[in-house]
């Protein structure tokens, strides 16, 4: 089994494969990441370790599900405690990816599975994102209206 630690952010995936630090764009389909994986590994032999970061980690979770890639989604509290136990203080995406990679030493193999995508939860998350955007726009327009009325 080949382990890959990934720190997920809005724009990028910071990846550590045990040897190299890499970076890929976090976008639907993750084409460049898939190309890298196929070139270097058999997808069935890979286990991806990452923390859930809400909407930002959804592309990665879907990618794993669609390509039958095993993943271990780390509870953020466990990851935080593991980082403290290692004595790491500096928080960069590269360091986080390396720490998530090291987390594989604590994982029971039976807990590494291909993620399942709940379509209803995905739809609700999309609605929630749209609603939050509409609220921000309303507040912004309200402030703009008040300023122009003065």
Predicted features and spans:
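Anion (oxyanion) recognition and catalysis
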Residues: 65
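Nucleic-acid-processing active sites and adjacent nucleic-acid-binding tracks
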Residues: 18-47
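Short, well-ordered alpha-helical microsegments
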Residues: 56-61, 111
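Gly/Thr-rich phosphate-binding beta-strand-loop-beta motif of the actin/hexokinase/Hsp70
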Residues: 1-18, 100
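Long, charge-rich intrinsically disordered scaffolds of nucleic-acid metabolism proteins
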Residues: 77-150
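Short, glycine/acidic-enriched loop or turn micro-motifs at the edges of active sites
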Residues: 10, 54, 78
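Short glycine-rich phosphate-binding loop at a beta-alpha junction
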Residues: 45-56
